[in-house]
Structures are given as structure tokens and as C-alpha cells.
């Protein structure tokens, strides 16, 4: 019988997390469940910092970026001694289950606590869109809008100065944001971690475009592939074209969530309560073909793989 649960946000924040918190709280209250907000992710659970949330506690947060509960990375959770303290705090607080909003690292933490007997439901909250078992993660579409706005502005100045602009996009090891940004932003080149990248190949393509009369270009690249400032210098040296690199950085994580992220987060938050009431307690939520689904969190973190969007890449290559 689920009477009292905790909700936390973990790892990198993403726009829409507040909407998910709101969804969990209000759906829980509608079923007579007490919901406690745990501050700063797993760290707050370790330190036993939590507060009872009411209907009014989550008023006026659906439109806010970030997370009102705070977030953190807490790799110490992998230690047996730390997990023992966490489980003791869960027991002392009489929490029957946890709802954990975050990325794949947060899911691993949820899996570990589930293994120790605490029912956990994972909700995918990350702009990277790199979580298995879901087409989209909370925050992805808002981050994409932020990136497109930046690319549009860079195109204005790149066109004026006839220069090449490199835009580094977040995503870790997933190129979804970069591919989508390249299509929506009209980028001339796209570089993602899923495909092998050679700087000289890019230079050759830029030279070909220049020979065809192209006077400026935008290159979208996922983070961690290379040093974009070194890449800019290499391109400038090889082509003679002024080249500048822009790292969008953490600005991509901020801002008011767009409507789709608010709706997705609200649906997933409410669905987490539905799953707990049905007896699920080792699962993560996803959306596939616009329908909410759930998967065993062990499968999602160990065996399932995020499907690569070859269709988007094919489109990007045709248009770039």
C-alpha cells in the first residue's frame, strides 16, 4: 500500500523538471498519497533533507526552468556504506517509494535502491535525449529551441562578415540535439559522436562549398568530439576563411520549458503515481509514438540502447 513517497531530481537539470515534480505531487495528492520533496537529489536523501509538499507548494512552477528541489551529482551512492545510510533514512522517514527524475546516471541509482527493496520509478529528465526506453526526454525540446535561437543569431553575423561559425551543442555521446539543430537551423555541416569525424574531410567540404560561391557556413558539432577552438583555427588556416567557435554550454539547460516539455513532464509525473498504485516499483517511464510506456529499470540501464535517428541524419545530409 503506497501512502507516502519521495520525489527528487538528480544529475544535470533540464527545463520541465518542475512540471514533472508538480505532476507527481498533484497526482499523488489526488490519490491520498503524501509526497515529500527531497532536496538536491541523492545527496539530500543521504543527508535526510526533505519536506512535505502540498498542492500549493507546486503552484506557479510549471513555467519555471531548473528544479525547485535542487539537483546534484552524487557518485558516492555506488558505495555500500552510503546506500546503507540512504536506505536507513528512507525507512526512518517511512517512505514507501521514490520517484526519481533525471538521466541514465540517476536511473542507475534508482536501480541500486530498488535492488535493496525501495520501489523506484524513473522519469527521464535530461536535455541530451540519451536515455533508453523513450523517444524523448524532458527538456530536450526546450534546449533545441534555445540552440536554434543561438544559431539564427550566429547566422546573421556570419553572413555579414562572410565567416564560418562552429556551434558546439550539448548531448554527451548522443547526437540527437545536434542533428535536429542542424536541420532546423539550416546548418551547412553536422558532426555527431555516432559517426567517425576527420577534420580534413570537413575542410574539403567547406572548400567545395566556397568554390560554388558559398560565402559563409554554420557547423553544428556535439560536445566532446574535439576542441572546437582548435578546429576553428585549423579550418581558418586551411581555407583562409575567418572561422569562430561558440560553445553554448549550460545556457542550453536553462529557460522556461516549451509547451511540449511541460505536457510531457506532467503526463510522466502523473503516470508515475499510476504505476506505483498498480504495484510497479522497479521501472522507468518513456514515451514511444506519443504513448506513455514503462520498462524494467534494470533492462533500461543494462541492456536497452538508445536508437540512433538515422532518418534525421539522412535528412540532414540531404539538406546540408
Swiss-Prot record:
Keywords: Allosteric enzyme, ATP-binding, Cytoplasm, Glycolysis, Kinase, Magnesium, Metal-binding, Nucleotide-binding, Transferase
Example GO molecular function: 6-phosphofructokinase activity
Binding sites annotated in the UniProt record for substrate: 126-128, 163, 170-172, 223, 244, 250-253
InterPro entries: ATP_PFK (IPR022953), ATP_PFK_prok-type (IPR012003), PFKA_ATP_prok (IPR012828), Phosphofructokinase_CS (IPR015912), Phosphofructokinase_dom (IPR000023), PKF_sf (IPR035966)
GO biological process: canonical glycolysis; fructose 1,6-bisphosphate metabolic process; fructose 6-phosphate metabolic process
Pfam families: PFK
Active-site feature positions: 128
Uppermost EC category: transferase
Binding site for Mg(2+): 104
Subcellular location: Cytoplasm
Task performed by this protein: Catalyzes the phosphorylation of D-fructose 6-phosphate to fructose 1,6-bisphosphate by ATP, the first committing step of glycolysis.
Protein name, entry field: ATP-dependent 6-phosphofructokinase
Gene designation: pfkA
